[in-house]
A protein has these predicted regions:
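Charged, cofactor-coupling segments
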Residues: 7-123
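Core alpha/beta catalytic barrel or barrel-like domain that forms the active/cofactor pocket
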Residues: 1-7
Length: 123
């Protein structure tokens, strides 16, 4: 993940979390916002990335954790269900329930109907 910008660049630092790309230029600190964007890429064919924004929160005196601050449904039409584990299906269903719970009261009826449809549990 990377820091989020509003005027300079969408990839603003100094914070970042990246495999094989070195350490962050600065410490991760409470209140920082980063992207969380796991993905899969098949070389020369296709790729998919699911991205959310997370904020760094203090969990204890010595431990920080992340809290999702951008909630959007995942397009399940892009998922090959036979490749998912039980825990992955369970997580998608939990995530979609959270999306609906956090957003539905801010939507009009048409929008809420759409959100309800796209956040239905998968199996």
């Amino acid at each position: 993940g990377h820091g989020i910008g509003s005027f300079l660049s969408v990839h603003e630092g100094p914070q970042k979390i990246a495999k094989n790309q070195g350490l962050s230029e600065g410490n991760i600190k409470e209140g920082m916002i980063l992207s969380n964007e796991p993905g899969f890429y098949k070389e020369g064919e296709y790729g998919i990335r699911i991205e959310n924004l997370i904020i760094v929160k203090r969990k204890s005196q010595t431990l920080l954790n992340f809290e999702v601050i951008s909630w959007a449904p995942i397009d399940v039409d892009l998922i090959e269900f036979s490749l998912l584990t039980y825990d992955e299906i369970k997580w998608i269903n939990w995530y979609h329930q959270e999306v609906f719970n956090k957003l539905s009261d801010k939507l009009n009826n048409k929008e809420k109907t759409w959100l309800f449809k796209v956040t239905q549990p998968i199996s």
